Amino acid sequence: MRTKSTGKKKINVITLGCSKNVYDSEVLMGQLKANGKEVVHEQSGEIVVINTCGFIDNAKEESVDTILDYVQRKVDGLVEKVFVTGCLSERYKPDLIEQIPNVDQYFGTRELPLLLKALGADYKHELVGERLTTTPRHYAYLKIAEGCDRPCSFCAIPLMRGGNVSRPIEDLVTEATKLAKNGTKELILIAQDLTYYGLDIYKKRELATLLRELVKIEGIEWIRLHYAFPAGFPEDVLDVIREEPKVCNYIDIPLQHISTKLLKSMRRGTTHEKTNALLDAMRTKVPDMAIRTTLICGYPGETEEDFQEMKAWVQEQKFDRLGCFTYSHEENTHAYNLEDDVPEEVKQQRVEEIMEIQSQISYDLNQEKIGKQFRVMIDRKEGENFIGRTEYDSPDVDNEVLISAIDTYLPVGDFVNVEIIEAYEFDLIGKVID
């Protein structure tokens, strides 16, 4: 039976998961647009591409539910074709083909040319930086590397994304320059591990060099670093953060735990003492650095003593931003060979205890901001307020600054000077300073 052509059909790209998936979808849509395809962001598309996440159980469930939803729409005649790509498809393709056969085709994370061909398009290698961005115009993600070479015992990312592949500095500068010409003011650098950047193609860590090139781009005002790895952290990056005004005094560095015993089992390449030494170095070199981290509760073998050690450490370190998650026992990871011996209710209780501590820390730190002035980027208008961020806050995950829109107009994407007049756990209230 002949398959209908995808030539003039509207294509709806649905993105699930993290910022790396957002970036990948933007690249896909940019390629489709360059091929003359019509990309839509509503449910009217005749062709649906689902970019899935396969990181932990909740993400996998959301991806499977979304696939099943659109397969049913296909059965009901509401869409013509359903294609699936991304991490879930990379990790479980044979199982998905067997269990959800009504999907037209599955693609892995490194099969963009094949996906484009199925959509009636050709992959154009020369289109460096040609993305159809889905973030607000004034900020954009810049993925500097794909994959990961780290051996973390709990993580399935290398199974889905492969080993680390850095992108050449010149390609990244070209892409960032195009973004700036289109109105982007903030670059959010992402990778599975920013600090590994360059080791594969330059034989040394080159994140600092990349940053010094990116700050030269006219129009870029903020450069933000997401997802650094603590072991082997290149401290020359701290010099760049301190010296270059465009590089935000902010870093997202998932630390996962502080028990040396568990860090060893996690294969993180660090210890309690080395972790604290790195944090001390960060705060010494960049005194007003905002540090965001992520922790795991309930890793195999985590005792009450290990947990109490982490609680005390969180109280001691007073991280500016912190997220905490329960351990997910992922097949084909090194930790899957260990007994998942912490009950789910204990994992969840530990997460809640950590987040209760962090909520108080966040409130106390925000209270200290009252009366101080900050440069704020306006992200959007919401009801009777404009919503913005300081350089110490990343979109969607950190503090927001609310500024009354009554008798005030603030263009989205503009910077304004703001004095903080009220503060809560995760929100700041400010007024514009002339």
Question: Which ranges hold each PLM region?
Answer:
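Proteins enriched for Cys/Gly/acidic motifs involved in redox and nucleic-acid/cofactor modification
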Residues: M1-Y197, D236, V247, I251, ...
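Conserved strand-turn element in the central/C-terminal portion of the radical SAM core barrel
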Residues: L16, P151, C155-G162, W222-A231, ...
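Radical SAM enzyme [4Fe-4S]-AdoMet core and its adjacent flexible, acidic
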Residues: C18, G198-G219, S265-M266, Y327-Q360
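Conserved glycine-rich "GG(E/T)P / GGGxP" loop and the immediately following alpha-helix
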Residues: G54-A59, T184-T209, E213, I217, ...
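Conserved, mostly hydrophobic/aromatic
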Residues: L172, L189, L225, I253, ...
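Radical SAM/AdoMet-radical enzyme domain recognition
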Residues: K181, A208-T209, K216-I223, P234-L295
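Short, electropositive alpha-helical surface patch
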Residues: Y202-V215, E235-N249, E302-F319, E344-Q349, ...
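Terminal RNA-binding accessory module
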Residues: N337-D434
